[in-house]
Amino acid sequence: MQRAAVLVRRGSCPRASGPWGRSHSSAAAEASAALKVRPERSPRDRILTLESMNPQVKAVEYAVRGPIVLKAGEIEMELQRGIKKPFTEVIRANIGDAHAMGQQPITFLRQVMALCTYPNLLNSPSFPEDAKKRARRILQACGGNSLGSYSASQGVNCIREDVAAFITRRDGVPADPDNIYLTTGASDGISTILKLLVSGGGKSRTGVMIPIPQYPLYSAVISELDAVQVNYYLDEENCWALNVDELRRALRQAKDHCDPKVLCIINPGNPTGQVQSRKCIEDVIHFAWEEKLFLLADEVYQDNVYSPDCRFHSFKKVLYQMGHEYSSNVELASFHSTSKGYMGECGYRGGYMEVINLHPEIKGQLVKLLSVRLCPPVSGQAAMDIVVNPPEPGEESFEQFSREKEFVLGNLAKKAKLTEDLFNQVPGIQCNPLQGAMYAFPRILIPAKAVEAAQSHKMAPDMFYCMKLLEETGICVVPGSGFGQREGTYHFRMTILPPVDKLKTVLHKVKDFHLKFLEQYS
């Protein structure tokens, strides 16, 4: 026994013998020979390939971060390596990322976030008492008094209460915290609700009505879920208005090949910047009630209204003002976010959705679905709390907060008018009034020769235009084909977020490029 133990410890076992045994050296030699004979795997033998992957994922497209943006990244790297270009920097006007464009954070929000992240600062005299009060309330509702803990899947309870109070103040209509779900940005809420709504196959597949032009999140999620995209076109000749007759046309035609169940509205519009009138919202709600459609109201730009003739009206408010027949029957989910407005806190990924008239059993299914991802980031939830619960009159931080808010929104209003005016001075560019949101979506003339050149490069004409704009000026914008547009029309989306001086530079560069482009291809 002792000798066997020593042999085991030394790793030298006695040779196996008999009809069932072979020496280890013999077995090793055979194994080595087998490995040599076995063919090496080639890439075609991989389990996950473009042919075997989920076809719905492969069908997803997201133009806001598509080929133009990838090319912009390549050009930035070339500039860093010292490769000469006709410009010295890439200006990323493709996305509504306020802080990346130089907008300064709102002081109060960052103070509360600092206190929540490092609670020892609660003892510092450098922070105002109203910021400390909010931070303490948030932390006391978190497990272990820490943002680093999980929250309930629906979100931190006191923050849901603050969201409900915000909606009540905004609309003059009571909001129930039990109908509030905190999300990882508004996008998370939109995709979650669509997951609940999509079902069926063949002609019974769920149809989702979306505006054209649209925010590409919608087409991407619809593709991912294997639903049917049902396009309704906004009226460009009437400042991108939503026409109920167009909704009826789209619905009628869609019923031949799918089961339309969902109507998505973006107000204020992205990429089109229109603000819907109260009458228009009433008409849409009546249409949804009449046709038994579930309403999705994307209202993340509700603070971004610049035209003095326009005012934001929430779908929730108008729904309740239309009376009990509507308010007790129309199913509605509305969405808001930390990313837009005047806060512009995109990176925190904070958001919420409010659901109205959702069946109790479906609410249970919603909580189950949300539980799979545990909870949205608690730091993003805290940021959402400051969006809906900012300083009030009489509080220490109110004056500074009001100055900063008015500065951001006032600047955006000036830049919206500047962009509209300058674009409309350029032959071959038409830009509707930028009533809200933070983008221009001008219509551009692309000559027939340029269309032919684009086709020879296997590009959409506006992709060809935007790629040349990037390569010749360093300005990164998104082609209108990524958002959808009427056949034969071409557009691009550009954010108005850069500082005024840089925005003027961008606009003049676009003007010079466009005139040169027209001359080259006419």
From Swiss-Prot:
Modified residues (N6-(pyridoxal phosphate)lysine): 340
Any one Gene Ontology BP term: 2-oxoglutarate metabolic process
Keyword match ATP-binding: no
SUPFAM superfamilies hit by this protein: PLP-dependent transferases
GO terms assigned for molecular function: L-alanine:2-oxoglutarate aminotransferase activity; pyridoxal phosphate binding
EC number: 2.6.1.2
The keyword Glycosyltransferase is annotated on this UniProt entry: no
One Pfam family per UniProt: Aminotran_1_2
Protein name in UniProt: Alanine aminotransferase 2
The organism of origin for this protein: Mus musculus (Mouse)
Gene: Gpt2
